[in-house]
Amino acid sequence: MWVTETEPPSYEDRAALARRATELARAAMPGVDVEILWDGMWVRRVGPDYFPDPDMFRLPASDAEPNWERWAGQARKHLRDAEDYWFYLYKPRPGDVIVDIGAGRGEDVFAFSRAVGPAGRVWAIEPHPVSFAALIGSCELNRLANVTPLNYACMDRAGDLQIETRPVWESNYVRAGAPSPASYPVKGVRFDDLAAEQGIERIDFLKMNIEGAERWALPGCEKALRRARYVCIAAHDFRGARGEGEEFRTLDFVKEFVAGAGFEIAMRDDPRYYVPYHVHGFRRE
């Protein structure tokens, strides 16, 4: 049986919880070099790799234990997923520049950083403060020196927004309007303005996965798209199809916008419900 955190108030309590969790994880995964530690948030070390996990002790009610197999193979999964989802057409080269809009907790950044190597650069943009803290932790602990994390929501104009927190963190989404009990304030920026401010000129690959906000983000990165070699924009019509709101139906808009930026478009026929909504853009040589 896994353990549950009750917001321990002291360093000693957290240290004891980390020791107990490490014992349980090692017992469940014999032969795996795993350690649970506290570094401003809960972190899981598996071999040489670190994975910040703010929800480590907040499992769904249906789960009595973590997915040990996933924990043991987390680094391999991140690398495999990037190859599957984002490197379908784009093939990274040492020295490339990748822009990751919707970087989450650093899952793809972990792979992107390795793919472009020390001479490359990854710009990782994530609006949710908890996810952004995990992203920073991942970059620091894994020494991803070629990654620059930025805490913004990419939109069509600058402004103050809210990011809504969902039970499954990957579904967090940006919106306008008043705060809610589950939202955080976030600064909205045009990516073209952010790119000018940060000196982002060359873009070999731009990935965007922002849970419906692609409808507003794409008009704010029109200049960047025109100088990118490859893009992959995730549309989210499947969220609209399951009743979460018509604003999530973005596929037609995304395809039109990407084509308008001069890209040829490729889609995938795939049984996974989200993969057919990845819009891959490439330029013919």
Predicted segment positions?
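S-adenosyl-L-methionine
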Residues: 1-128, 133-137, 142, 250-285
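Short helix-capping segments at alpha-helix termini
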Residues: 118, 140-145, 199, 224-227
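Conserved acidic-Pro-Pro-aromatic motif
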Residues: 193-285
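Active-site flanking residues adjacent to catalytic metal/cofactor-binding acidic residues
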Residues: 99, 125, 152, 206-208, ...
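Glycine-rich adenosyl-binding loop in Rossmann-like folds that engage adenosine-containing cofactors
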Residues: 48, 52-86, 145, 150-198
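Hydrophobic pocket-lining residues within nucleotide cofactor-binding pockets
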Residues: 103, 154-156, 210
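Short, well-ordered alpha-helical microsegments
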Residues: 109, 132, 157, 214-216
